[in-house]
């Protein structure tokens, strides 16, 4: 089916879409769809055109929230709103949950900082990148290493700093306090019990860094996400703001996101006028970054329509027959 023939007036390039894709694109604007299927069957393509379809049906572009697990996965959506004939007016917000958290913290900082342990909540926050977080962490941990910390392991110091931050990030995306880092690592360790001291030291360094951040209004990824989940998301003021500004959701590659993100969306989903959740049945490879396909699949229960795409655009018939 040719897009131009079926969607006259839409600002989209000519593209051959299948009937299942068109059905998803043209579904009523007030619907909750869970779209799943293997890679290469056109799920993201349908989602991008669904976004454009909503805009051209009169849905305000700024009321659309597009969520992806990593910014690199948002390329198709970002490119579609950069074309010269994109409908003038507002633009959809294309974010990760982490990006949304940072935006809300910046907007509601007095509310977020209150009762959150910051030494001076009147000062504005400073958001850290991975590089700046490692820089501050190195200043705290280097003296400890010189005093004998981590002496039983051989690892590049930058790699060690990265691992300590990763431990904090894992605690935030899964939803457990950083004070449990050591116990969880020891529980998963199958080697010599004497090595457990390394995990105690790693937790001590992580907590030292967290204290330093709270004293200086520095927010790394883990603190941003925890602050949003524990203090802003439960706030009626923040929830009302989000519900007022975003009435339509497109959430792509949900299987690559982490449990805390899924929990937030499951709570938020009933408030959206329309939502399209996209699940790749062949993915979920970023488990080392916190991806949880099992958690992602639970969102399906909150959707009205379940749609499966099966026909691949990238596999040859011969390869499909082998499978």
Regions found by a protein language model. Give the residues of each.
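Hydrophobic residues on the short alpha-helix immediately C-terminal to a glycine-rich phosphate/catalytic loop
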Residues: 28, 50-54, 77, 268
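Conserved glycine(s) of the Walker
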Residues: 42-43
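Conserved P-loop NTPase-based nucleic-acid remodeling module centered on helicase motor cores
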Residues: 61-172
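Catalytic acidic motif of RecA-like/P-loop NTPases
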Residues: 254-258, 283
